[in-house]
């Protein structure tokens, strides 16, 4: 017997508070280790954070964030329902609205990072499992000091990420991911977060590497990490970790599994596999060139930014 979907309304959030009042309790319930400030970041970037209101409710009971980037790529995130409203067809209503928006934007690539339990759900919706994104974690340097030392004969000069024109941050990101995330790298968004900072590498006037980190409930989340060489990736990660030398809590990062050196790098600095990997899935198996085997992403993206945005 098929149950009827309750009457409902799907619409974009009116303001940040409307999203955050649903987002924050769900993040705590699911243990996704995302900060309140992350919600503000994604809301600022997205023009259509979708919420669903069952007829009997004055507050939203589910959400879905479709991120539509300027280069006709899209990312699907935060597809979540409150427990009492799961299994009633409301998620399908949210999904249809997302598909309408993505179709209207004529997106060529649509991706998402799925938790293992949801892979079959997305497979039925036409997504193909194309890569893994292992979650890595590390105890603080207070609890577990760095046990490795090396010379810096080949070290390069690092610059504060905020001193680099967002146009160049966007371009380096695009070259590694195929996603045009200029709205994230705008001066008033990621670079402006008070709970975050990062470093870049500029060689011969060209931006070749960057690392970014932000606070999360359990400690600090690192990513993205792009670098032209393993040595430079190690220098960026080592520097950033040392800047959090007195931090309590843990480090977290999402590793781009297609880069075989990514996990090795983090393990060299004392990180461990957290026991779970996201499944990077693409609609109809269409993967941006920048993330395929042998691409710049496969050799230079050591950590992704966030499962919520690619």
Residue positions per predicted region:
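A short, well-structured alpha-helix characteristic of acyl/acetyltransferase catalytic modules
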Residues: 2-5, 15-26, 144-153, 162-175, ...
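A conserved beta-strand-loop-helix scaffold within acyl/acetyltransferase catalytic domains
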Residues: 6, 10-82, 180-220, 224-228
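Amide-forming acyltransferase catalytic core, primarily the GNAT-like/NAT-type
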Residues: 23, 125-221
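Conserved GNAT acetyl-CoA-binding A-motif
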Residues: 74, 101-115, 246-258
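Conserved acetyl-CoA-binding loop-helix of GNAT-fold acetyltransferases
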Residues: 78-81, 87-104, 120-124, 230-243
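Residue-level recognition of the GNAT/N-acetyltransferase active site
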Residues: 82, 86, 115, 228, ...
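Active-site/acyl-donor-binding loops of N-acyltransferases
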Residues: 113-114, 120, 125-147, 250-310
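Structured C-terminal portions of repeat-based eukaryotic scaffold domains
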Residues: 205-257, 264
